[in-house]
Every structure is written in structure tokens, then in C-alpha cells.
């Protein structure tokens, strides 16, 4: 019996041991190990995406030589665990300082294109150029220049014609640049807003304000109606007051339009930095988190809307967006309470992150603005965040990860439990000083978050996460072209249902590419879902485009889904342009463990069979001996 027990213990250890093809490396900190990424120290990270369609993230960088920038990409080699340069499609910018960078397939030809905002070093003017990749010449061609543009443009698939558009500010107006099969068209932003001025009473008051930053501008479903909304950070050029605008997506005249109600316009305190959108408390509604500048505090704005849902219904079928007509009298729901800072009160809204006030948020506004990066590092299904702090005494910067913790609220929340962050639940990286930007990466492509640091010396550094988490994960991506992994949609929503260990069911939410217009954001294309220790499958997984013409085409449901895997989903418009076709590929990860686990199971079963055979033979031998001893007196 002891031997059998030992075999089961050994088998359990084999199944739960964390295997890695990376050897133990020096510079361990909180279970993270640094290793060389093979990227030169004169290169700056610009963007993460999958260049070569191998289902792994690559990195686009800008390498400086004197006043010239060479934009190139490094392909991740998962076997060697390094990046290898692909120098065949370089783009050289002469006398240009890059301010903003976006990579995607803009003209829908399955080749990657760039939108680059830069300062011309000869004239100090800001322009934005669109570079389209020409597959015949195997090079990038500058197709359009937005002259004297604001640097804060962003990309979203607004409207009803299934195409990425560039939203920018120029000559006192918000404008939209869109691509057709033959040309590039510039439209006024007003073409995309609702004509119902009774309900949308803020449309004509704020639609021409400049943008504060593209990092905060987002295209995502804020009210849970399965249609994406525009979230815009703006300012009044006359008063310099900052605002948050939430333009709700609606159907009007068989088109998608955007409606700005006056009670979804929020004035922002100048002490608030660039906000991040995420679901803090995992109630399937998106919240907003602001860093408070020159402090170590954050402001959490919880979404006031809640999900009304029965587990047997189709969520999007029962949560449809508004359809407005000229006579519509519906009201637009208020999404947030006013954003009020109380720096002297560490309540659940204004959260002090560190004990020592000498540590404040690091904000390199000209190059890498302060931005909180949220992902679930410990896979407990709640988002944690990564940022950099500056020590006013030592003049050095340090990355820190803050883990989400459960907090009980007062009676104003009717006893509900929300999430916040604690000074005592952190990963610190004090040995990594003078870091400019820190962000998440997934080197092993297994849903477990690794890190990339970019330091003051211009070195891009990789940290491999060797912590072991006893939980499940899921990753998914929605593409608008088949097997084109840089053709990812912005702001796609993934809702999924699981059952907790205690038997209660819950709906969770994650989004892909919520905010990634400025290079300082450096976010991954996938939506990463930490499932925690729920049941071993996702009962209902619904992916929502948020941009398609009719609500019935807007989403697709899959059930059940295996965790520790990735869903690759794409939709195409049928030839008759009346129906959207969806396709899904399920990739079970991590594949590197599979052969070892299968071998372990075979060995374990073989050992158990041999051991059982041995016990059976031993028992027969003992029975024979006992029988001989029993019948010996009679048979001599």
C-alpha cells in the first residue's frame, strides 16, 4: 500500500510541476528571471503584434542612428527564447522623432501597415503619415500625410462598413480617415454622430474638442449592450479643462451612430493622469482607474451599471443596443459617478499604494507617459497592474506589480464586495533601477504573464515568470481576416461563464486592444482571462465584435471551451454582404508539456500494472504456500 501511495504522490508531482525550456537564470526577483532578448541597446519598443502569423507575439522597434530612425521587427523564436531581426522590410525615417505608432492591416490586403505620428526635426511641426506595405516591391510606401495634425490620433472600427478608421484632430475639428479599395477618404467626425439632439444633448457641444491623449481614447462596450462605445479624453482649448466623454453606440437609420448624453460628460481634475479601462471587480462591466499625478495614489471609478442576467439566456440576444429615431425618448444611462479626488482620505476610491510618500508615479510624458497596465499576473481572475515609481531621494525608478485584493465596502454599496489594491500584496523589482517603461509579455505563449522592461540606457530586457499558479487561464483573439494575427479588432469583448468551487456561477469579461494607440501603451493583442480555481471548463464563451451592422451578427457563442488553451476567432463578410461568417480555431496550450504528461501517464499506468501483477503473483504464491501448510497433515 505504501508503494502505491508513493506512486500516486509522484504522479501528482509530475503533473503539477512547472516545466520550462529556459534554464534557471540569475537575477531572480519574486520568481522572475532575466534573460537576453537579443535586441540591440539602441532600439526602443514601439508595438507588440504577431508579424509572421505563428500565433506568438513579436516586437516592432525603432533603432536610432544619429537623427534617423529605422523601424524594424524582431520575430520571437520560441525554441531559443530570443528575438531574431527580420531586416527585409525596414522603414527608415529621416529627421523624424516618433510620437505615436500603430500597426495593423489598414487596407485589408493581409499585409501589415503603419500609422506614425512624428515631429519633423527640421521644422518642429507634427505630422502623421500612413505607410502601406507594397507586396510587389516588398517595401512600405507613404500613402498619405496628415499635416499639422495633433499627435493624439487613435484607431477604431467605428460606423457600419467594417473597416479600421483613424480618428484625429486637425484645424479645429475632429476628423475621420477611412480606407476604401481605391482611395483614402477624409470625413468629418460629425458624420458618425446621432442626429437626435434631445437624447444626445452633448453631441454638438464637445464634438470639436481636441484629444488629451490617445492612450485614454478607447473603443469598447461600456454599458454592456454588445455594441462598442467611444471613450474620449478631451480638453477645452479656451479653458484648458479636461473631460471624459462616453459616446454610446446606437442604431439609427440602419447604421451605427454615436450618442453623447450630457450626463456622460465628466470633468476631470488636472491631477488625474491617463486612465486605464478594465473590469476591476469582475462583475462583467468595465471600470476606469486613474493614477493621481505626483503621488502614489490611484482613483478607482466603478461602473454604476450592473448585469441583469439569467444563466440560461443568450446574453447579447437580451441586451441589445438602443435604436434611435427622431421621436425616440429613451434616456441614456449614466455610467459613472463624478470623479472626485480626496487625497486626504484613503477610502476605496482614492487608494494609497505605498507607505513611503517619497515614492511617486514616474511620468515621462514626452516619451512614455504614465499609464497603468492591467493584466491578471497571478491568474486568480482579477486584474493586477504594473507601473513604475520614482524615488525622490535616490532619483531612481522601480517597477512594481500590485495584486488585486478583496475589500469590503460600506453600506453605500449595499454590502457588495469590490476589489482594490493593497500596499502588502506586491511584486517589487528594486534591483531593476532606472526603468523607463515596463509592460507584460507572454514568452511561453501559455497565458502566464512575463515582463519586458526598457531602461534609461536603451536596453530592452526580458523577465521570465517562473512562479507557479494553481489555476486555469484562457486567451482569445478576434481577427477580421483569416489567419492574419496582426489583423486584430480593437475593443472586442469576451464574456464567459464559469462555476466557482463553492458552486456559485459568475460571468466574467475581458477585452482585447482596449487602448494601444500611443507607443507607451505596448499592450498585447490577445484578451487574457484568468479563471482561478473554477471548474475545469468554460461553460459559455461569447465573443462580441461590437462593430458589425446588426446585433445578431455582432457576436458568436461557443460552449463548452477547454481552459489553458487559446481561441482564435475571425469573421468574414459573406459575398452577398447580408451575413457574417464566423470561424474558430482552438489551440490547446501549453503544447510543450503535453508529450511529457503523456509519457508520465504511460509510465505511471505501466508501473501500476506491473505492481498489480506483482501483487497478484505474490498473493497466489502466498495462497499456494498456505494451502500446502493447511492440507499437509492429510496429504503428508
Where are these regions (language model features)?
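Repeat-based blade/solenoid architectures
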Residues: 34-46, 90-102, 144-154, 194-218, ...
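Gly/Ser/Thr/Pro-enriched helix-cap/hinge segments flanking short amphipathic alpha-helices
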Residues: 411-439, 444-636
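Beta-propeller blade repeat segments, especially FG-GAP/WD-type strand-to-loop junctions
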Residues: 16-31, 68-88, 124-143, 173-190, ...
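Cleavable N-terminal signal peptides of Sec/SRP-targeted secreted and luminal proteins
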Residues: 2-16
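Solenoidal tandem-repeat scaffolds enriched in leucines and small polar residues
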Residues: 124, 130-131, 135-281, 288-294, ...
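Structural signature of eukaryotic scaffold interfaces centered on beta-propeller domains
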Residues: 47-53, 102-108, 154-161, 218-224, ...
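Acidic/hydrophobic-patterned starts of short beta strands in beta-sheet-rich repeat architectures
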Residues: 53-63, 108-117, 160-169, 224-233, ...
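An edge-strand/N-cap motif at the start of beta-rich repeat modules
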Residues: 17-61, 74, 78-81, 112, ...
Amino acid at each position: 500500500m505504501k508503494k502505491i501511495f508513493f506512486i500516486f504522490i509522484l504522479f501528482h508531482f509530475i503533473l503539477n510541476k512547472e516545466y520550462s525550456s529556459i534554464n534557471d537564470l540569475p537575477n531572480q526577483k519574486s520568481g522572475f528571471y532575466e534573460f537576453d532578448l537579443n535586441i540591440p541597446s539602441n532600439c526602443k519598443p514601439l508595438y507588440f503584434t504577431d508579424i509572421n502569423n505563428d500565433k506568438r507575439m513579436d516586437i516592432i522597434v525603432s533603432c536610432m542612428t544619429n537623427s534617423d530612425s529605422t523601424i524594424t521587427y524582431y520575430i520571437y523564436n520560441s525554441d531559443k527564447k530570443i528575438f531574431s531581426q527580420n531586416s527585409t522590410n525596414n522603414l527608415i525615417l529621416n529627421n523624424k522623432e516618433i510620437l505615436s505608432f500603430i500597426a495593423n492591416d489598414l487596407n485589408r490586403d493581409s499585409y501589415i501597415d503603419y500609422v506614425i505620428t512624428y515631429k519633423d526635426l527640421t521644422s518642429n511641426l507634427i505630422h502623421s503619415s500612413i505607410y502601406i506595405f507594397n507586396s510587389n516591391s516588398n517595401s512600405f510606401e507613404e500613402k498619405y500625410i496628415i499635416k499639422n495634425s495633433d499627435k493624439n490620433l487613435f484607431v477604431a472600427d467605428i460606423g457600419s462598413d467594417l473597416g479600421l478608421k483613424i480618428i484625429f484632430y486637425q484645424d479645429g475639428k475632429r476628423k475621420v480617415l477611412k480606407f476604401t479599395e481605391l482611395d483614402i477618404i477624409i470625413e468629418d467626425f460629425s458624420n458618425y454622430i446621432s442626429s437626435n439632439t434631445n437624447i444626445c444633448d452633448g453631441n454638438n457641444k464637445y464634438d470639436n474638442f481636441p484629444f488629451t491623449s490617445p492612450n485614454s481614447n478607447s473603443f469598447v462596450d461600456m454599458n454592456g449592450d454588445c455594441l462598442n462605445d467611444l471613450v474620449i479624453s478631451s480638453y477645452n482649448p479656451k479653458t484648458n479643462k479636461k473631460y471624459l466623454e462616453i459616446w454610446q453606440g446606437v442604431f439609427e437609420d440602419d447604421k451605427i451612430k454615436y450618442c453623447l448624453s450630457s450626463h456622460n460628460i465628466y470633468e476631470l481634475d488636472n491631477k488625474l493622469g491617463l486612465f486605464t479601462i478594465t473590469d476591476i471587480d469582475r462583475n462583467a462591466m468595465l471600470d476606469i482607474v486613474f493614477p493621481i499625478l505626483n503621488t502614489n495614489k490611484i482613483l478607482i471609478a466603478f461602473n454604476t451599471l450592473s448585469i441583469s442576467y439569467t444563466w440560461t439566456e443568450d446574453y447579447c440576444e437580451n441586451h441589445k443596443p438602443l435604436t434611435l429615431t427622431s421621436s425616440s425618448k429613451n434616456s441614456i444611462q449614466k455610467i459613472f459617478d463624478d470623479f472626485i479626488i480626496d487625497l486626504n482620505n484613503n477610502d476605496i476610491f482614492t487608494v494609497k499604494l505605498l507607505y513611503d510618500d517619497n515614492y511617486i508615479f514616474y511620468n515621462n510624458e514626452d516619451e512614455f507617459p504614465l499609464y497603468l497596465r492591467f493584466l491578471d499576473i497571478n491568474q486568480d481572475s482579477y486584474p493586477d497592474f504594473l507601473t513604475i515609481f520614482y524615488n525622490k531621494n535616490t532619483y531612481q525608478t522601480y517597477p512594481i506589480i500590485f495584486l488585486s485584493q478583496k475589500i469590503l465596502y460600506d453600506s453605500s454599496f449595499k454590502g457588495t464586495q469590490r476589489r482594490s489594491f493593497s500596499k502588502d500584496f506586491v511584486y517589487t523589482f528594486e534591483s531593476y533601477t532606472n526603468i523607463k517603461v515596463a509592460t507584460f509579455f507572454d514568452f511561453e505563449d501559455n497565458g502566464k504573464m512575463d515582463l519586458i522592461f526598457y531602461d534609461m540606457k536603451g536596453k530592452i530586457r526580458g523577465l521570465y515568470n517562473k512562479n507557479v499558479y494553481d489555476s486555469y487561464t484562457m486567451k482569445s483573439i478576434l481577427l477580421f481576416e483569416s489567419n492574419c494575427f496582426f489583423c486584430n479588432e480593437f475593443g472586442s469583448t469576451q464574456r464567459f461563464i464559469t462555476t466557482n468551487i463553492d458552486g456559485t456561477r459568475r460571468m466574467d469579461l475581458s477585452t482585447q486592444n482596449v487602448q494601444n494607440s500611443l507607443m507607451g501603451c505596448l499592450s498585447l493583442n490577445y484578451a487574457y482571462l484568468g479563471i482561478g480555481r473554477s471548474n475545469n471548463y468554460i461553460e459559455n464563451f461569447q465573443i462580441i465584435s461590437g462593430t458589425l451592422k446588426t446585433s445578431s451578427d455582432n457576436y458568436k457563442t461557443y460552449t463548452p471551451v477547454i481552459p489553458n488553451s487559446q481561441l482564435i476567432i475571425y469573421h468574414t463578410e459573406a459575398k452577398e454582404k447580408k451575413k457574417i461568417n464566423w470561424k474558430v480555431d482552438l489551440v490547446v496550450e501549453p503544447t510543450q508539456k503535453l508529450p511529457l504528461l503523456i509519457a508520465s501517464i504511460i509510465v505511471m499506468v505501466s508501473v501500476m500494472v506491473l505492481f498489480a501483477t506483482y501483487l497478484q503473483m505474490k498473493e497466489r504464491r502466498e495462497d499456494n504456500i498456505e494451502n500446502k501448510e493447511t492440507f499437509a497433515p492429510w496429504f503428508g
